[in-house]
Amino acid sequence: MKRLFPVIVCVIFGCQGDIVEQNPYLNNLPSFEFELNLDLPLYDNLRFAGGTLTLSQLGFKGVHLYNLDGSQILAWEASCPNQRPSDCSKTIVNGIEAVCSCDDSIYSLVTGQPLSKDVEYGLVNYGVRRTGNLVLVY
């Protein structure tokens, strides 16, 4: 028991939770659920790998959808993650990147990570569930 006690103490105090740094510019994003049917012509671009679509009615400044590989769809908040909300703090899709209108910072639609230097926060990710041609964004 004497040998087991130090091991237990090390395990208990050695385990720390992951530290998640909250983006101070985008901490109160609206919650939503939106279902789309890829059979409809409006969403046809999302049926193929590399396809993108921006839904301006969702999220804070809109939601960018990106078809990663023909089956997996990713969803990102369209707000610039390193800017206070303003008239120009929206990202615009350019291929597989999102570019901030305010400072021209570039973000990957594949990972959400910034591609520009000296940028602290990446794009905010939304959940996506796909069942056949029905896609739920939340």
PLM feature spans:
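Sec-dependent signal peptide recognition
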Residues: 1-7
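Short cysteine/histidine-rich metal-coordination sites, predominantly Zn2+-binding motifs
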Residues: 94-104, 114-124
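C-terminal motif of bacterial Sec signal peptides marking the signal peptidase cleavage site
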Residues: 11-14
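N-proximal short alpha-helices
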Residues: 16-19, 101
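N-terminal pre-ligand scaffold of iron-sulfur
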Residues: 18-95, 108-109, 124-138
